[in-house]
């Protein structure tokens, strides 16, 4: 393919060409095949990475840690209480220190400007594990899952995002669909539609790759003939508790139900980046059930637990795709 990502940071998918994204996906598949076959792939022995987390995580942290160790690298995890970044030491200075000690830096936090500042100053590749604006590593896992379920023929497929279409996952999903030639449909209330910045950036990319971007408030219009129906939590990390009541009122009509899946193609799949509020078996789920009288939020338990739900394949694929994201610039 002739793609070279050596030394590059992975901050948002708009920075990468279609060919580069396809290369990372092919690499991810290779790593998954090796992992499944028990074939060692410690190609980065002797290198070290640091994981900077301002926001808590299960999948992102585990995927980076296991992925790095599988590749033979040493890993340091720094949570907000373990580093002076942004408190006693600027992000610029932190980047310059860590860049002297580590071969790569992962950042999961709030501002996109922070991860870009790290990348500008570290002198080593920096990987965006999530910011308020973008979630690029999640997208590779999502697309690998779509590929696996549609015999790697994804061009022309239709991906629907239901709910808060302005969040980091929905924005990133629009980008990756446009880059890879999949039709993208954002379905939610007017106040939860994606911003003009991402729509304007993606529209010409989609046109170039022969696909479309659609914004709609109609669940029926969105779900009819869909190949993939995707949703995410209604309130994102870092948002105040006060928004719950408004979000539930706004987004309840956009819950993914069996009726939604029935409108989609017979082979359609359901995706969710997790964690999901599909029952009351969590502290927050139980609390909101008592407060608002709902036992399911963005997706029904029936859909979540159905054969069409590929959410745990998707979660596993975080590890294989993140491995590719680390390996490509460090090999």
Stretch-by-stretch model annotation:
Residues 54-66, 151-232, 237-239:
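Glycine-rich phosphate/diphosphate-binding loop of Rossmann-like nucleotide-binding domains
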Residues 154, 178, 259-268, 306:
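Short, conserved loop/helix-junction motifs that constitute active-site signature segments
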Residues 204-301:
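Rossmann-like adenosine-cofactor binding region
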Residues 289-331:
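C-terminal helix-to-coil terminal segments
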């Amino acid at each position: 393919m002739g793609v070279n990502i050596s030394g590059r940071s992975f901050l948002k998918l708009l920075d990468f060409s279609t060919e580069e994204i396809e290369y990372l996906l092919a690499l991810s598949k290779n790593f998954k095949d090796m992992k499944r076959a028990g074939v060692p792939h410690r190609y980065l022995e002797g290198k070290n990475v640091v994981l900077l987390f301002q926001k808590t995580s299960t999948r992102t942290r585990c995927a980076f840690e296991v992925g790095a160790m599988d590749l033979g690298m040493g890993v340091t995890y720094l949570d907000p209480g373990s580093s002076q970044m942004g408190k006693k030491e600027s992000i610029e200075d932190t980047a310059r220190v860590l860049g002297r000690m580590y071969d790569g830096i992962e950042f999961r936090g709030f501002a996109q400007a922070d991860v870009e500042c790290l990348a500008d100053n570290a002198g080593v590749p920096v990987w965006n594990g999530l910011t308020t604006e973008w979630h690029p590593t999640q997208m590779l896992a999502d697309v690998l899952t779509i590929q696996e379920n549609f015999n790697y023929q994804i061009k022309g497929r239709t991906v629907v995002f239901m709910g808060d279409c302005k969040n980091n996952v929905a924005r990133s999903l629009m980008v990756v669909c446009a880059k890879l030639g999949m039709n993208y449909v954002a379905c939610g209330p007017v106040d939860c539609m994606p911003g003009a910045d991402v729509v304007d950036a993606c529209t010409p990319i989609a046109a170039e790759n022969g696909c479309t971007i659609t914004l709609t408030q109609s669940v029926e219009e969105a779900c009819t003939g869909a190949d993939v129906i995707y949703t995410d939590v209604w309130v994102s990390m870092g948002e105040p508790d006060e928004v719950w009541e408004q979000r539930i009122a706004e987004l309840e009509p956009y819950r993914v139900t069996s009726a939604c899946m029935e409108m989609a193609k017979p082979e359609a799949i359901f995706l969710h980046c997790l964690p999901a509020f599909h029952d009351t078996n969590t502290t927050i789920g139980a609390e909101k059930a008592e407060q608002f009288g709902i036992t399911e939020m963005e997706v029904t338990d029936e859909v979540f637990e159905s054969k069409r739900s590929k959410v745990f394949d998707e979660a596993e694929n975080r590890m294989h795709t993140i491995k590719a994201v680390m390996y490509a610039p460090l090999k």
